Design a protein with these regions (language model features):
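Short, exposed beta-strand/loop patches in secreted or surface proteins that constitute
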Residues: 1-3, 109, 245, 268-272
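Extracellular, disulfide-bonded carbohydrate-recognition/adhesion ectodomains
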Residues: 1-151
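A structural micro-motif recognizing beta-strand termini
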Residues: 13-15, 218-221, 284
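Conserved, well-structured core segments
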Residues: 66, 106, 144, 168, ...
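Short boundary segments that mark the start of a structured unit
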Residues: 151-264, 273-280
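Short amphipathic, basic-aromatic surface patches that mediate peripheral association
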Residues: 172, 284-288
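Solvent-exposed loop/turn segments flanking beta-strands in beta-repeat/beta-sandwich domains
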Residues: 179-181, 287-293
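Solvent-exposed, low-complexity segments and loops of surface/extracellular structural proteins
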Residues: 263, 282, 290-293
């Protein structure tokens, strides 16, 4: 299970190698986590310790850790985060801040062998000619922690006349590198599904990089003179996406304006009749009678 802090979603990914863990994090639409302060560091400990710690590993007690987005280019002793930012907050373990050690792929140690809490960063020394892999039996490097910017969705309102078809727009802001499915569901107001419009129940998929989608809405026509009618279309997350969708405006108010002919009829006589002679009028629209007082 993942967790949200601020505008980012965090989750555990697999990866015995730092590069594999990073690739899996990027496949979610983010990267390995960049830790900016002690609040974020402790947030990771609180939420993911139980997922990565191996109980009584090889009889040596509870141990576990996860790759984070800390790395060092081998031709440059400057360490940096995977997003290119410099390191402003650090929480290295003993002797882990030595820039002379050839390495790539920092990890966050989440628990000591004796089961006590641990919140320090450690590095994995490597020969410069090797990949950043480790033995599959190693306890500390089975996972990585991904950090993915959240996507925020909103849906536009719509006003249209009876008999018309128009488009409604769903917009996406924030992180757009993940694939997500958005559910659309209509609910009656004064307008009724079946008689005023076709009920809406569908899924719209956003591919990585897409920021908006439109879908068409059609209002039925009738000959009844009535007030404007309304309904609501709500958007929600599918519940099955790797990254949960967030919403800034999840409700669209649809107003269907009456289009029935409300013009008062006019009459003109085609003939002149003698007073008192009956005249027959033929009218091809429904009439409503009003009883005179």
């Amino acid at each position: 299970m993942g967790a949200i802090l601020g505008q980012n979603y965090y989750s555990v990914v697999n990866g015995y190698e730092w590069t594999t863990a990073r690739s899996n994090a990027q496949n979610l639409g983010g990267d390995l986590v960049v830790i900016n302060d002690v609040t974020e560091n402790n947030f990771l400990l609180d939420n993911f310790r139980s997922e990565v710690v191996i109980s009584n590993f090889d009889g040596a007690g509870d141990r576990g850790g996860a790759w984070i987005g800390l790395h060092q280019v081998r031709t440059n002793t400057d360490r940096a985060w995977v997003d290119g930012t410099t390191i402003s907050y650090t929480n290295y373990g003993p002797d882990q801040d030595k820039a002379s050690v050839p390495w790539d792929g920092g990890y966050l140690l989440l628990m000591k062998a004796d089961g006590s809490n641990q919140n320090t960063w450690w590095i994995e020394p490597q020969d410069p000619l090797t990949t950043y892999s480790i033995n599959a039996n190693q306890w500390a490097y089975r996972y990585g922690i991904a950090e993915v910017p959240l996507s925020y969705y909103s849906i536009s309102d719509l006003t249209l006349s009876e008999g018309d078809t128009s488009s409604i727009t769903i917009s996406r802001t924030g992180g757009t590198n993940s694939t997500q499915n958005i559910l659309l569901t209509s609910s009656d107001g004064t307008a009724s599904a079946g008689s005023d419009y076709t009920a809406v129940s569908q899924t719209i998929s956003f591919a990585a990089g897409e920021t908006s989608k439109t879908f068409n809405f059609a209002a039925f026509t009738d000959s009844v003179t009535e007030s404007d009618e309304t309904l609501t279309i709500t958007i929600s997350g599918s519940g099955s996406d790797d990254i949960p969708a967030q919403f800034t405006d999840n409700s669209s108010l649809i107003t269907i304006q009456n289009s029935a002919d409300t013009t008062s009829p006019t009459f003109s006589s085609a003939a002149t009749n003698t007073a008192g002679t009956k005249v027959i009028l033929t009218y091809n629209e429904a009439l409503s009678a009003t009883t005179a007082a």
